[in-house]
Structures are given as C-alpha cells and as structure tokens.
C-alpha cells in the first residue's frame, strides 16, 4: 500500500502553483494597461450574468429570492463600475457587494443541497453567476493606482494628495502581492562592479 506523504504532494503543489500565479500577474498587468477596455468587458459580463439569471428564472424555475438577490448584486456591480478603476475598499458599494457575494453563495449552496443538478451545471452557475464578476473586480483592484490623474473629483490633484494624504508612493493590491512573490521566489540579480 502506497501512502500519500508530504514528500509526494509538495512537488506536485509547487509545480501547479506558478502557472496560475503567472497568469494572474499577466492579467493584472493587462487590466492596468487597458482600463477602458476592462471596464467595457466587465460591463458585458454583468449583462451576461443578468441574462443567465433571468433565463434560469424563466426556464428552470429557480427560486425568486435567489434570482432577486443575484440581480440586486449585479445592480451593485454596476454601481462599482461607475468609478472603475478607482474602487474604494471602504465605499458602501464595495462593502455591500462583498456581503452580497456571501449571501449569494449561501443561497446557492442551500438551493443545490435540496435540488439535484449535475456537477457541470452547478459549476456553470457558480462560474457565470457568482464568481466571474467578483474575480474581475478583485484582479483589477490595483488598476486604479497607475492611472493618470483625472477630473473625477474636484480638488483631487497630485499636489493636494501629496500634502494631505501622505505618501502616495505605496502601491496596494494584487499586483504588489504578485510582485513580492515573484521577487521572493525568483529574485533578480544585480551586477556589482
């Protein structure tokens, strides 16, 4: 009998971890570079998710409360999209969207525990109605930090931000996490003369 040990599992985990991390890093770079196109793509994803939810209600008779919460969540996502790529983590829309993601998951788990559907259909529901839009917003959290100043808010210029908010050189978000991981795993060598 062959036992599964940490020595067997660890190399597999280490081999499977870098490709998704590299893909997410590249995706974060693309989102930072093309914020207008990303906003448009997220808007189409929200419309697609809304159409899927309406179709599930009309053709599959999914519960009204589950579809209603999903549609309200998409409405909140449209509110987040109004200030994209500048997403404030303390804004009511962002906090409400995080809470609604949890509520949507609870309702979906409760529904699929009572009703049998094949795994592929359950996975499709979770992917297109619950995961894809929050994932898109999550990956694009760092996109607002590298956009040039605009006229979105009066008095929000570079000089007043520097003096009122302190250091603006700090970068936050998923891109910083991936940059740290990249430097920790594959440190760059500097030539010393």
UniProtKB/Swiss-Prot annotation:
Subcellular location(s) of the protein: Membrane
**What topology does it adopt in the membrane?**
Multi-pass membrane protein
Residues crossing the lipid bilayer are: 1-21, 39-59, 67-87, 94-114, 122-142
Which Gene Ontology molecular function entries are recorded, alphabetically? Answer: COPII receptor activity
Disulphide-bonded residues: none
Decide whether keyword Membrane is in the record: yes
Provide this UniProt record's keywords sorted from A to Z.
Answer: Membrane, Transmembrane, Transmembrane helix
Q: Which Pfam families match?
A: Erv26 (PF04148)
GO annotation terms (biological process): endoplasmic reticulum to Golgi vesicle-mediated transport
Q: Which GO terms describe its cellular component?
A: COPII-coated ER to Golgi transport vesicle; endoplasmic reticulum membrane; Golgi membrane
Which family is it part of? Belongs to the SVP26 family.
User: What protein name does the entry list?
Assistant: Protein TEX261
Organism (species): Bos taurus
Its gene is TEX261
